[in-house]
Amino acid sequence: MTLEILDIMKLLPHRYPFLLVDRIEDLEPGKRAVGIKNVTINEPFFQGHYPGHPIMPGVLIIEAMAQVGGAVAAITAGDKDDQVPYFTGINKARFRRPVGPGDVLQLQLELLSSRRGLFVFSGKAYVDGNLVAEAELKAVFAPRSQD
């Protein structure tokens, strides 16, 4: 299953500038997904991280992985229109190399477990086939806030 940006926006509450996934490829509900983030110089975080040497903050790479995991969790859980996935934990995070403008992040998420509404994922981020970051991520569903 492939999800384009409008499909992703139906599953996740994130919007610009914090929606960090452009497309999800090879989504297998209850198992795994591969997300794509095209990193451009127009990203707002590059203004301050770092001027003259733009590097995508590691925490945003983790967030991009979490968003792919959130989409997998949403598809796996089924009818959750009144709820949204919340990122609840990070374990074993490692950053292997910087990510910058022009890079295409490939975000590979594997669902390790899903019990009592807690989803645990193994996430890895690659650029050109090279591992740039990895982490274990956790998420739960909670009611969508009433605006």
Curated annotation (Swiss-Prot):
Compartments (UniProt record): Cytoplasm
Major subcellular site: cytoplasm
Disulfide feature: none
Biological process according to GO: fatty acid biosynthetic process; lipid A biosynthetic process
Catalytic-site annotation from UniProt: 49
Protein EC: 4.2.1.59
UniProt xrefs under SUPFAM superfamilies: Thioesterase/thiol ester dehydrase-isomerase
Catalyzed chemical reaction(s): a (3R)-hydroxyacyl-[ACP] = a (2E)-enoyl-[ACP] + H2O
GO cellular component: cytoplasm; membrane
InterPro entries: FabA_FabZ (IPR013114), FabZ (IPR010084), HotDog_dom_sf (IPR029069)
Domain of life: Bacteria
Entries under NCBIfam families matching the protein: fabZ, PRK00006.1
General function of this protein: Involved in unsaturated fatty acids biosynthesis. Catalyzes the dehydration of short chain beta-hydroxyacyl-ACPs and long chain saturated and unsaturated beta-hydroxyacyl-ACPs.
Family statement: Belongs to the thioester dehydratase family. FabZ subfamily.
Protein name per Swiss-Prot or TrEMBL: 3-hydroxyacyl-[acyl-carrier-protein] dehydratase FabZ
Species this chain originates from: Syntrophotalea carbinolica (strain DSM 2380 / NBRC 103641 / GraBd1) (Pelobacter carbinolicus)
